[in-house]
From Swiss-Prot:
Assigned keywords, A-Z: Acyltransferase, Cytoplasm, Fatty acid biosynthesis, Fatty acid metabolism, Lipid biosynthesis, Lipid metabolism, Multifunctional enzyme, Transferase
EC number: 2.3.1.180
Similarity-based family: Belongs to the thiolase-like superfamily. FabH family.
Complex formation: Homodimer.
Gene: fabH
One BP term from GO: secondary metabolite biosynthetic process
Subcellular localization: Cytoplasm
Annotated catalytic residues: 114, 246, 276
Pathway: Lipid metabolism; fatty acid biosynthesis
Region (ACP-binding): 247-251
Domain comment as written in the entry: The last Arg residue of the ACP-binding site is essential for the weak association between ACP/AcpP and FabH.
Protein name (record): Beta-ketoacyl-[acyl-carrier-protein] synthase III
Amino acid sequence: MLKAGLKSIASYIPEKILSNADLEKIVDTTDEWITRRTGIKERRIASENENSSDLGTKAALKAIERANLKPEDIDAILVATLSPDYFTMPSTACKIASNLGLVNISAFDISAACSGFIYLLEQAKALVESGLKKNVLIVGAEKTSSIMDYNDRSICILFGDGAGAGVVSLDNENHILDVHTASNGNYGDLLMTQRSQKSSLCQTLSMQMKGNEVFKIAVNTLSNDVVEILAKNNILAQEIDLFIPHQANLRIIKAVQEKLNLSDEKCVITVQKYGNTSAASIPMAMNDAYEEGRLKKGNLILLDAFGGGFTWGSALLKFGGENF
C-alpha cells in the first residue's frame, strides 16, 4: 500500500535583514549577548504590506511546482501560524487558497505555535492515507514581527519572519514514516500572545515568554520525545541521516543533538540567520538542506519541535526520490 509522503518542500525568505547590530540601536542588548544566549546573528523581517498569507503563498507556489503539480491539483490547504492575517477570521489558509485561485477545497488553520509544522504533517498524513484527500498543501507562515514588542529585549531578539510549504500525497518513494504530537496546557502562561485590553476587541497583541522556564522544559521534553519515537520505530539514533529541529535557540538544539549523539554534519541549523520563525522554521530549514544538497536519496530524517501551549512533536521521514 502506498504511504503518504512529503513530495516537495520550499520556502520564502523576506529580503529585509534585522541584525543584532540593528537591535543594539533599538533595545538595551549586545550582539555578544544575543549570540552567546541564542546563537542568533540576524533574522528576516517582512515588509509592511506583506502578511503571513503573502509569505505562505510565495512558498506554496514553489512547493506546488516542485511537486510537479498545478494549484488546481490541491484539494486541501492546512496552515500553521501564530501570526495570522486576521485576529479570528478569515483563516490564513482561506487567504492562501484565494491567492492561489482555489475555491471549494478544504482550508483551515492549526494553532500549535512552534510545533505547528509537525501537527500539519500528522493531519495531512491522515487525510491522504484515509483517502479523503489526494494532494494536501501544508504551510507554516509567520510574520512574528506583527505581534512583537520591540521594547522587550527578552523576546524581540529571538523571532523572525518567513514561510515554508510542502505537498503531502501518496508516494512510493518519499514516506512520512511516523508522526507524534502531544501537549500540556498546564504551562500555557509561560509562553503566550497576550491581549493588551481584555475588555475590548479593539486591542493589540504581543508575545510574552518566561524564557528560562521554557528552556528547561523544552530541552527535557524534546530529548524524551525523540528517544520515544525512535524506540517506537526500532530505529537507532546513529541511523538518522539528517536531524532537522525547530530553530528556536542554538542551546536547545545542541542539547537534543548531544542527547542523540549526532555529529554536526547530521544536524541542520539555520537559527543563526533566520532566528525563530515558529511554524515556518522546520520547512525553511529543510528547504535550505535541500538546496545545499544535504538531502540525499534514501535519507532518514528526524524532525522535532516544541512550542507554546505547550505543544511538541516529532516526525520520521524517508527521502526516497529526487522530486524536491
